[in-house]
Amino acid sequence: MIRDKNILAIIPARGGSKGLPGKNTLPMCGKPLIGWSIDKAKKSTYLDTILVTTDDQKIADIAQSFGAYVPFIRPAELATDQSSTYDVIRHALSYFKDTESKEFDFVVLLEPTSPLREDDDIDKMLELIVAREDEFDSIVSIGEVTEHPSIMKRLVGDGIEPFCPELAQ
């Protein structure tokens, strides 16, 4: 913990990918895609709990084999194309509060489809936000843009929207 902070990592991994079915369990350089995010989270010195939230038993089994905590299978209504990450996070936090009487000071969202983190990325981000928590309530990592504009997002006010709405479908 950083200064007695409880920190939760949430790795959301839906089973019903339309673009690449089963992508979270597909091998990438010798391990399932989801395994990369779990392994990086385990290298953090600050994360108290590494939770995988999924609607898919195969993903849950793989996540547990990598050492993640998977105490529930995500409800179907939170595993659709229209489900928001925000709602998935709220569900996970409600689970901990209601079932385990546990609350967290910070949540780290680790998308399994962004596996190329450096070993210390998570801890550096946590150190930064904890040191400046009176100024910021969230932090996000960014990198050089290599994606097509149709899948890019931009900040608008306190939300995110498609960079090119006319291309997003």
Per-segment meaning from a language model:
Residues S17-P21, A79, P112:
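A short acidic, helix-capping loop that chelates divalent metal ions and anchors anionic groups
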Residues A13, T54-D55, E111, I142:
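Short beta-strand/turn micro-motifs composed of small residues
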Residues Y46, F66-A68, V156:
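Short, structured coil segments at secondary-structure junctions
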Residues L51, K58-V108, K124-E127:
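Short phosphate-binding loop-to-helix
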Residues R3-T53:
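N-terminal glycine-rich phosphate-binding loop and ensuing alpha1 helix
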Residues D87, H91, P115-Q169:
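Conserved core of the sugar-phosphate nucleotidyltransferase
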Residues I7, D48, Y69, D105, ...:
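Conserved acidic residues
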Residues K42-Y46, T99-E100, A131-E133:
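Short helix-capping segments at alpha-helix termini
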